[in-house]
Amino acid sequence: MKYILSIDQGTTSSRAIIFDRNANIKGFAQKDFKQIYPHPSWVEHNPNEIWSSLLEIISEALANARTHPNEIATIGITNQRETTIIWDRYTGQPIYNAIVWQDRRTAKICDELKTQGKDKIFLEKTGLVLDPYFSGTKIKWILDNVSQARERAEKGELCFGTIDTWIIWNLTKGKIHITDYSNASRTLLLNINSLNWDDDLLQILNIPKSILPELKQSSEIYGKIDSSIMGTEINISGIAGDQFAATFGQSCLQKGMAKNTYGTGCFTTVNIGHKPIINEQKILTSIAWVKKNITTYVFEGSIFIGGAVIQWLRDNLELFKKSSDAEILAASVNNNGGIYFVPAFVGLGTPHWDPYARGTIIGLTRSSTKEHITRAALESIAFQSFDVLTEMKNSIKGFDIKELRVDGKASQNNLLMQFQADILQCNVVRPKITETTALGAAYLAGLAIGYWENTEEITSLWKSDKIFEPLMKQSQREDLIYNWHKAINRAKSWIE
């Protein structure tokens, strides 16, 4: 069989990409879906709309590749992480909308748990901080607030899943209820040392174990899709949360290698090898993948608003019509005009972990223009990534980043990538294939069935497209960073 189908279910769109053995894209399709904002800081998706979008793009990608389902060797799945769905085990219907990773409604639950001193337990067992970002408190909220949900969960009538679980449930017509360790490591429920759902954590959050999916490796044959989906049965053999799939797709397979994904949010991962290292409260430790019974761990810095700040300028302020116009506007001025934009629309992630921070544009004068604001918005993405990598340097003994591999839509923005290199004072390397999230899922799926022989083969497929080298004077860089930190401190703890 010729190809691998990779399903990349993201925060704002679903994508299907068909790869060949040389990692060339043979077919592509993408479909946006609705973002639901019931209240300030609440973010939801319609799970059925996500599923219907996948059916559309699978068909479209096959048509674009001019291929038939019989030529698909296997399917790999990657997904927005932490986003939480609970559905009826018998009807397959969700009992509530998907609560998205950006959603902050459970901040008070996290505060109460911290007051009880539970944050240390969660950190030691899961490598995560107590934050609304993760699935555990979202599950608790649904069970506590949706009519009869807790009662039905305790009777075994409900299933929980992150998006990967929901996709596979639907692809197999409810026959398979699984997740992989990488997605599970973002729930606040998985012990990343023992690789088991943790009974103590389930008890703290009052979540019945019966709703949880079975744990699987990131690269193994899980089963086949139902023949009604594509007209034939096809193996599913790869799963990884989006940032971990991107890490694999970037061939960051050796300890110390780092990548940054510039998507809706911005996510930096550093491969830390095969033993978990728990950081004191600021940098997350997660499972990147489990393959052939070997676990690879990463440090991660999570920035909630990355490329989404450009979407906000486009849709909410209507400063431009296309996201690609942002680079043109920003490049038309020599600097940010003294403006600093802290896009804390849903709080701040790594290293601040402040759910009560809010967005701030500071330094405005009568001479400020939309060009300056747009440039400040782009620069905010690089500044936030700088803060994450600085914290990582402080956390990993002997770690000094020499090269940052980048991907995601915003990595195509040359102005942003050059500014990132300048602020970090290291090379920023963009690969020829920037669809690394989908590619990572394809690699994991392909390795499970022998489509690719080993990781050495896939590493040989990685090629650099452009290297951005630091050019900025040190004094200018230091001034920018100093003012950025002044601005971010103004944004913190805004909501009381």
From Swiss-Prot:
Disulfide bond positions: none
Reactions catalysed, as given in the entry: glycerol + ATP = sn-glycerol 3-phosphate + ADP + H(+)
Keyword Oxidoreductase carried by entry: no
Binding site for glycerol: 81-82, 133, 242-243
GO MF entry, a single one: glycerol kinase activity
Main function: Key enzyme in the regulation of glycerol uptake and metabolism. Catalyzes the phosphorylation of glycerol to yield sn-glycerol 3-phosphate.
Name of the protein this chain belongs to: Glycerol kinase
Native species: Borrelia duttonii (strain Ly)
